[in-house]
Amino acid sequence: SFLDKVKKNLPYYIKTKFVIQIPWYRYYFEKFIYKKRGSLLMKDFTFNKISFNKVQQLTNQSKVILDIHNPWQNGLTQRPFDALGNGKALITTNASIMEESFYDEEIIQVVNRDIPTIDTEIFKIDINIIDGFEEYSLENWSKKIFKLINNYD
């Protein structure tokens, strides 16, 4: 599986914890019918919705967030915004992030889904909010909405 490849390509001293939320029937179907999921065990998955507080707790405990997007999806998922907004580095399979104004290759790594090679320097850097990311803040979004409403005559 992709996560097995990620774990294999990381040095032993980098601790990983994967939290994967999928429906239970999908796990069983992929694990036993398609023989996917590699060495990942049932304990690596959660089959219940993860609360906002739990997501925030896991994000706070993390140095880097891994985003594995659906290859048929267009655009970004919420995870890049959550990661970067919380001052975390990001590793993603979604190359469309490179087109965003806030893209910074020092704190955002785009990896190949088939051969995920990760530059471990990403685990050593400390980040704050990055240039261009302010555009996606709640405050800026609110200003845009009210400007649209006021200009809607």
Question: Which residues does each predicted region cover?
Answer:
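Nucleotide-sugar donor-binding catalytic core of glycosyltransferases
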Residues: 1-77, 92-103, 140-152
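Conserved donor-binding/catalytic loop of nucleotide-activated donor transferases
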Residues: 60-62, 84-87
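Short, structured coil segments at secondary-structure junctions
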Residues: 86, 104-106
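Conserved acidic donor-binding segment of nucleotide-sugar-dependent glycosyltransferases
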Residues: 108-115
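A charged, aromatic-enriched C-terminal amphipathic alpha-helix characteristic of glycosyltransferases
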Residues: 115-153
